Amino acid sequence: MYCTGDLKNRHRKLHVKSRIYLAGVLGLVSATAQAQSGDEVTVQSGRLAQKQFDAPASVRVIEGDAIRNAGVQVNLSEALAQVPGVVALNRNNYAQDVQISIRGFGSRSAFGLRGIRLITDGIPATTPDGQGQSSTVSLTSADRIEVLTGPLAQLYGNSAGGVIQTWTREAGEQPQLDLSTTFGSYGLRRHDVQFSGRTGSVGIVADYSTFEIDGYRKNSAAERKQFNGVLTSQLQPDTKLKLVANLFDMPMAQDPLGLTADQLKADPRQAGNRAELDRTRKSVQQNQLGAVLLHQFSPSLEMQWRLYGGTRSNLQYQAKTFFNPSSWVDLQRDYVGLGGQLKGKESNLKFGSMDWILGFDLDQSSERRNGGETSSGEKIATLSTSKVYRDELSKARNTDAFMQMNWHWVDAAGHNPFTITSGLRYSRVQLDSVNYNPASGDNGIGNLNSTAASPVLGVTWHTTDQLNLYANWGRGFETPTLAEAAYSVADSLNSVVPKFNQALTASKSQHSEIGAKWTPSSGQRLNASLFKISTENEIVTALSDSGKTAYVNAAQTLRQGAELGWNSMWSEHWKSLFSMAWLDATYDSKFDTKKTSGGVSVADKSIPAGNRMPGIPQRQMYASLQWAEQGFAPKALGFSASADWVSRSAMWASDMNDAVSRVAGYDVVNLRARHRSQWGTVRLEAWAGVDNLTNRQYVGSVIVNQSASTPQYFEPGLPRNWMTGIKLSVPL
């Protein structure tokens, strides 16, 4: 616990650390550099495409080969480990998905994504209220992943603590069939069939994959089937259409729940309290179709339209707790969205040129929520005996408009010393819930409406061809999701009940960042940034209990951090990656969670100012050394190998920062070996890997603010485990 004086001293020390770090970065990048052109990779910097080297933001790109080399291509956490500022924790619990946070946004999530926008092939994969599921991304057909952090992410609207965009690979000129199979520890099986080809102006990529695992822990088996198809057609020389179909079917994912510290120590492979008895599990099915139409009026003016829609069903069985019976929740969601944008370039301005974009997003989801009690893991469906207690219809919709301008200032000598970026997004988000079960009274009734203007401003100083310095600032907001508003803390202590949480409000945040991008020589690239984020009414976990989680608004939070990324190509055969992130995420002022006693609202627990936000390690490091016999080109043959190191510092699972919720830091080493060969036109690729080479025992993820009566915070990481696979590529 920190007193006011301690907190001031602590912040003063953080500011000193920031100055020292910045001085080191500027000293490093001011060293003599060899003449070298900047990074030519084009990324989405805010809403406008821009060279990665020139963008006034932290933008990282993971190419297709890196995605495939990272693991079995099942979880986004495999590839995202290398991105500074992104904490991707594998729960090894496929019922709840991986836990991903960007600069601390998303760490509160009990399942799926929160605080992060997910976009696949130009189609939003995040609902209007801010929910997303990373498991629906098809990694077996992914060509590229981009991660945008910092102020410019606010141009994507609600819950844009960061933006993750993925793209399916383009079809080649020659039809090709790819067959792959992967096996691993604990009964892991993944099989994939992919067809790609092009006929005239029409190209298609169709990918179907299956995944099964018996699970490391008891009650942790899972099964998935997934199809991802992208059809592109050049309708006219200046008009292109992309159709996207994504089908995701997870008929069964058992939920082992978390473990207490004593359970973790006794046997990390066991399931949590009553998980086996109540057969805790989840089934999910999602079908989505989308279309993106791009028309170019001229080389300097283009228009884009996007339309999508889909359905999602989610059936979950939850365990009995001390206060609540075992239960089930059935969610049936329909969603639809429309967006448009006009993008242009003005080249004949007096002082340079300008890129600009204007656009809008309209999205809506409708979710029918039913719930009731279970017996031995099966529904008790008798309404007259109050065994079915939820029948609600919840809707989320957003109406957004946005704009962005990049002004490339050119001086009298024809040089471009500065690029100034400005943007604004106006958002209106509405959440409504109505109740159709008279027995539950007004428990399912409520609404939350939020409006916000999110301005951003940034500048890049092109000091040399090898060095760019940038600074940016922005404001953002985040609404509660429908799932977060669906539960409240009960009148009694340590209990979560199915009641719409009318007390939740949207959080408001202010982001600032400075950074440097340096390419000292061919094959060397260094990115460094410092940032500060202040948030009011941050949405945090009040209480979590066996799959049911209630949330509350904290008064103020503060995030201060530094990120460093260094990519090096040492020779044709050797390269390395290194990233480091330091994040101090704290409650900047004291706040209380509430309960009701005798009809009066009283304090439940008091969180002191200075306590660290749970689920966020203060330090994270990643290093990878890679070797390739015949170089790193995507089609290079021969042997290749890599050794990766991931290190994370300690973190807390409770905002009380008590000893029982502290998780020790850890280091793990992963190895990969691969061989590619070719006979005629047929290519064969075989690979093998070992994760956690040293067999380190560690906690892979935490469930934030579990009930004090059953503090099942911990989800164990895997011990040493192996995987091996083979892929056959046959031109047709």
Which stretches of residues belong to each language-model region?
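Surface-exposed extracellular loop regions of Gram-negative outer-membrane beta-barrel proteins
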Residues: 251-264, 364-373, 379-380, 428-437, ...
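N-terminal periplasmic accessory domains that precede
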Residues: 76-79, 99-103, 116-120, 133-135, ...
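Membrane-embedded beta-barrel scaffold of Gram-negative outer-membrane proteins
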Residues: 294-296, 302-318, 462, 468-474, ...
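Gram-negative outer-membrane beta-barrel transporters
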Residues: 343-348, 409, 420, 525-534, ...
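Signature of Gram-negative outer-membrane beta-barrel scaffolds
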Residues: 353, 357-464
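Transmembrane beta-barrel wall of Gram-negative outer-membrane proteins
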Residues: 176, 183-212, 217-255, 280-299, ...
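Short acidic/polar hinge/loop motifs at secondary-structure boundaries
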Residues: 107, 116, 123-149
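Conserved C-terminal beta-signal and adjacent last beta-strands/turns
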Residues: 21, 122, 234, 246, ...
